[in-house]
Amino acid sequence: AGMAFSNALLGITHSLAHKTGAVFHIPHGCANAIYLPYVIDFNKKACAPRYADIARSLKLPGNTDDELVDSLTNMIKDMNKSMDIPLTLKDYGVDEKEFKDSEDFIAHNAVLDACTGSNPRSINDAEMKKLLEYIYYGKKVDF
């Protein structure tokens, strides 16, 4: 598995999981599951056709790339629900004050994480912080 990860590269889903796992003690797999739909929405500006191809191969509904990407992220959220994986950091139980106190540190260090360089869309500290906030509150990524 490690060889596959090394060859595939991982992107900001893992960058976030590394840093929030360390701060909030979220198991890595659970963190990745929570973050994946948000990261797909963030990345779709850079690679929506690729995500749409995945959705098509899964026979998900949609005519446009945006509709197909939405179907893909909805499917992931439904899978998470079926396994009792929370959809947000707030639902996971991360205290809001603790989150606010840590988000700058997490965002900055997630940008510096080794996995960030392989993400299909570049991201800076401010965008990473905003993405974290969307993940905490469950807001649809719109930037």
PLM regions and their residue ranges:
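C-terminal charged capping/lid subdomain of soluble metabolic enzymes
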Residues: Y51, P61-F143
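Active-site segments that bind and position negatively charged phosphate/pyrophosphate groups
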Residues: A1-D78
